[in-house]
Each structure stands twice: as structure tokens, then as C-alpha cells.
């Protein structure tokens, strides 16, 4: 690799001085290095050391295969780097494919908030931004895409960072126009759109008959462009289902856009859905695409459709019927090709009868209904679901975690009114209370409003005289009542409730019970 002039200590603030220094060193690399691969490696190193950018990557476009391949990558070495030779992105696929097809920069303020990010390299920090810019090429067709991740979250600097990367892309465009992929795959290698692992059908855990039937429907639905209405209680995983349908469908390489129908007042809905032209209203300083345009060619997920107003329903019905729309303040009719997946926890049939939901919109949406069973209807699935969720929590926390068989059996005694979301919250709460990496019964705490049917360990005696205990009390009140009954002696109260001392101590701490009464 070309040795670049020394420029003092690494710059840790991305300001004008850092930009000029980085651009100067990049120009030196391009002028001194005739080998394209080595020049790109030097440029990405400059972005890391002098522009506060990590995991820089250059993907080049292969016309024969109509796909992008990874030409240069900074931040990983050895075998992991060799594996990137087989990574490909189709036009419009993921962030990189979207930058290539749209021929414009794309900024994700946080990777975790954007479903287009595919994470095929498994190196990026989900809490930080990602910036992709097209590298100019011949015939108005980008030669490839330059991608980098800022090392810190400074949303006010994203625009400046994007402009800087666009300048870098322009600098490297000339040598890249004549570049050919040095290590391209054989011509017969297919370019395939892979499903992001977090959205695969393997995320739908359960062997119960209800889940098997749901999975059979999902696999069939994913093959076609049919409108889908996902129904189920809060916390059953409706958004997860929508993700799985999209990313296992023929539209997987296109955008997946989410919109919560209850999140905005009516006066903002039209602009959010259909976009607006510059000057359409006070504050419209630029033209803005709406959710339908952003989802063109892909899928639009309309969450909480049952909460929408009559005005919103009328606007939505028009575009579903005609496939056409105009931006607010515009007179040009735009055609959009969007698959609709809607979700609700309401009984829409009752809402239609009550006049709260348009009957014609109901029939437009209810082409292929998918009903998700409540967790209480498939308690046996917890045997597989709990370890699966514990593994996810362990990955987030960066440590080893296990769950005991006894804890799983205890979880299966609860009715889970909050469904899978409540189960995951319960397990994460338990994980915080264990230092040994084992989630056991004594750190399982259910929500206060409902206790499990069998919340005690086998062999521990329950109090036989329960005249002192109001069975309508929630769990916190039951613990306080037992403590008052026993003079605030924890060991005695634990025996009265059929708990271990550790269990009651844990509940006293979590439930914020004041022990200073004695």
C-alpha cells in the first residue's frame, strides 16, 4: 500500500479541517497509486483515520450480472474479509442496491430503524448511522457505491458527512470507470436475494397446531402480491409477520416501508403518505416523497389500521383502487406499484357494523387474512420460544445466558395477556437479575396485574389459612400482606407464600416495597 505523508495525530472531530486533510490525502493516494485495489484501500484507510468513518466499503457494479460486488472493505481482516468476495447486491436490493438504482445518496440516521439494511457483512453498529453515495460512472450510470459509517451519532453532521463522501466518490470515479472486477465469480454463479436472518420464517417459533397452520398460510402468501390483513392481539408479532412476508416474497429486494396509522393527526397524514411539493404549505422548503413513493416496487406495512380515522380511510381507499396519487401541492399524477400489508388488533367486522370502519376498505384489505394466535392459546410453544428469546437477549447483552427447565415450566403457567412481547420483557427483566448467566425460577417476575396459576416451586408449602389474604390482590399487594402478617420477617412471609427467601427478596426489590416500616 502507498505510504501517505504524515499529517500528525488522528483527527477526532469531523470538521472542515478534517475534510480538507482527508481530501488532500485521498488525492495523494490516487496520484501515487496506479493499482486500483490498493488505491481504494488507501482511501478507505484515510476515511477511517482522518474523517471519523469506520467500515468504509466500495462496491462496484458488474454489468454482466446486473449486481454490485464488494471491491474494497476497511475494518475486517483475514478469513472474514475473504468471505466478502461472495457478497453481491442486486439493483434496488438493500441500502447499497437502493443507492445504485436511485442514483442518489441514502442516509440511515440509525441502522436499526431502517428495514432495508441487510447486514450481510455482520460488522456494522446498529445504533449508528450509515451513509451510501453513488460513484459517478459513464453514461449517467453509477460505477458503484461508496459506503461508510460515522463513528458517533451526530445527526446534525450527517448532511455535511454526506456531502463530503459525495466529493470523495467524485474523486475516485475516474480511475474506477475503467476498472474491471478482478476477482468476480464465475458467470454461472447466480445472484440471489438472501433473506435477512432477523426476518426469516425461523423467527416464527412454535410447534403447536395453531402456529403450524399460520406458517403454512404465510409461506403461501409470501409467493404472491396479494394484499394481506394480519390480525392478532397486541404483542403477538404482527410486524414480525409483515417483515417475513415481504422478505420472503418476490419483492424482497425492494423497499419495505412501515407506517403507523394512529401515529399522526389527520392534517399530517396526507403529506406523510403522499408526499408534498416544495412550497405546498408553510414549512415545505423542499419536495418530499411520501410513504407510497418510498415503497414503490416494494411493500407498505400499515400498522394499526383499525385506529385510522374516516378521513384517512377515504384517502387510502382511493390509492388502493386506482394505484395513482398526487403529492400535496402538485398536479402530476404518479402511478405506484405497492403491495399492502395491514395489521390490526381490533375486530374490524364489529367496527364496520358500528360505522367506524369503511366497509369498502375492509374488503379491499381483507383479501388474505392471517390470524396470529395469542400466546395463552399455545403455551406449549414456550418450551421452544423461551430459549429462543433468551438467546436473542444474550446477543444484545453480549454475554452467555441460559434458562432452566424449571423456569420454562413456570413461564408455561402464566396466561401472558401481553403475549410474546410480554414474555420477552419478562425474560429480559430476569436476565438483569442474574449474575451467573442462568435464568432460574427465582428471578422470574410476572406483571403485577396477574400472577401465574402455579407460581411456587414444587414441595414448598402454601399457607392453608388464607382468610387473611384477599384473592383479588395483585402480586405486590399479596407480598405486602404476607409481610404484614408475619411482622415483616422475610423468611416467614416467604414460607407463607410458598416462596424461597431469595424469591421474596427479589420481589421486594423489583416491586419497590418499603421494608423500613419495621
Curated annotation (Swiss-Prot):
Residues 490-509 bind DNA. It comes from the Bacteria. Residues 433-475 are annotated as: Inter-domain linker. It holds the Pfam family HTH_8. Keywords: Activator, ATP-binding, DNA-binding, Nitrogen fixation, Nucleotide-binding, Plasmid, Transcription, Transcription regulation, Two-component regulatory system. Required for activation of most nif operons, which are directly involved in nitrogen fixation. This is Nif-specific regulatory protein. The lineage of its organism: Bacteria, Pseudomonadati, Pseudomonadota, Gammaproteobacteria, Enterobacterales.
Amino acid at each position: 500500500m502507498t505510504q501517505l505523508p504524515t499529517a500528525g495525530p488522528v483527527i477526532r472531530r469531523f470538521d472542515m479541517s478534517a475534510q480538507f486533510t482527508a481530501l488532500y490525502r485521498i488525492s495523494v493516494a490516487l496520484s501515487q497509486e496506479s493499482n486500483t485495489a490498493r488505491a481504494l484501500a488507501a482511501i478507505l484507510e484515510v476515511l477511517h483515520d482522518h474523517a471519523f468513518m469506520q467500515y468504509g466499503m466500495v462496491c462496484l457494479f458488474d454489468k454482466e450480472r446486473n449486481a454490485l460486488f464488494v471491491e474494497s472493505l476497511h475494518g475486517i481482516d483475514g478469513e472474514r474479509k475473504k468471505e466478502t468476495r461472495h457478497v453481491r447486491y442486486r439493483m434496488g436490493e438493500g441500502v447499497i442496491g437502493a443507492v445504485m438504482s436511485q442514483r442518489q445518496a441514502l442516509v440511515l440516521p440509525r441502522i436499526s430503524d431502517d428495514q432495508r439494511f441487510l447486514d450481510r457483512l455482520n460488522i456494522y453498529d446498529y445504533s449508528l448511522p450509515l451513509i451510501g453515495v453513488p460513484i459517478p460512472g459513464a453514461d449517467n450510470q453509477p460505477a458503484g457505491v461508496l459506503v461508510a459509517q460515522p463513528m458517533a451519532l451526530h445527526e446534525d453532521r450527517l448532511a455535511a458527512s454526506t456531502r463530503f463522501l459525495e466529493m470523495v466518490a467524485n474523486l475516485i470515479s475516474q480511475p474506477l470507470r475503467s476498472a474491471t472486477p478482478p476477482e468476480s465469480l464465475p458467470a454461472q454463479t447466480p445472484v440471489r436475494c438472501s433473506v435477512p436472518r432477523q426476518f426469516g420464517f425461523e423467527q416464527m417459533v412454535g410447534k403447536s397446531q395453531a402456529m403450524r397452520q399460520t406458517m403454512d398460510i404465510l409461506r403461501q402468501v409470501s409467493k404472491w402480491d396479494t394484499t394481506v390483513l394480519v390480525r392478532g392481539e397486541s404483542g403477538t408479532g404482527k410486524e414480525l409477520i409483515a417483515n417475513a412476508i415481504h422478505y420472503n416474497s418476490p419483492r424482497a429486494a425492494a423497499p419495505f416501508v412501515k407506517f403507523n396509522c394512529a401515529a399522526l393527526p389527520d392534517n399530517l397524514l396526507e403529506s406523510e403518505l403522499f408526499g408534498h411539493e416544495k412550497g405546498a404549505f408553510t414549512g415545505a422548503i423542499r419536495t418530499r416523497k411520501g410513504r407510497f413513493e418510498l415503497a414503490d416496487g416494494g411493500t407498505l406495512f400499515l400498522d394499526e389500521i383499525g385506529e385510522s380515522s374516516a378521513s384517512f380511510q377515504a384517502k387510502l381507499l382511493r390509492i388502493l383502487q386506482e394505484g395513482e396519487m398526487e403529492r400535496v401541492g402538485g398536479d402530476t399524477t404518479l402511478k405506484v406499484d405497492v403491495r399492502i400489508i395491514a395489521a390490526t388488533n381490533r375486530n374490524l367486522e364489529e367496527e364496520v357494523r358500528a360505522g367506524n370502519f369503511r366497509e369498502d376498505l375492509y374488503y379491499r384489505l381483507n383479501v388474505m387474512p392471517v390470524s396470529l394466535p395469542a400466546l395463552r392459546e399455545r403455551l406449549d410453544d414456550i418450551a421452544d420460544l423461551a430459549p429462543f428469546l433468551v438467546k436473542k437477549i444474550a446477543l444484545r447483552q453480549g454475554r452467555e445466558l441460559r434458562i432452566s427447565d424449571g423456569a420454562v415450566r413456570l413461564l408455561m403457567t402464566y396466561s401472558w395477556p401481553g403475549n410474546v412481547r410480554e414474555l420477552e420483557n419478562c425474560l429480559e427483566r430476569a436476565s438483569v437479575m442474574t449474575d451467573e448467566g442462568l435464568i432460574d425460577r427465582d428471578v422470574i417476575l410476572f406483571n403485577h396485574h396477574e400472577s401465574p396459576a402455579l407460581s411456587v416451586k414444587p414441595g414448598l408449602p402454601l399457607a392453608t389459612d388464607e382468610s387473611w389474604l384477599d384473592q383479588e390482590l395483585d402480586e405486590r399487594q399479596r407480598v405486602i400482606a404476607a409481610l404484614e402478617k408475619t411482622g415483616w420477617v422475610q423468611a416467614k412471609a416467604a414460607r407463607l407464600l410458598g416462596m424461597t427467601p431469595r424469591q421474596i427478596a427479589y420481589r421486594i426489590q423489583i416491586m419497590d416495597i418499603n421494608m423500613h416500616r419495621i
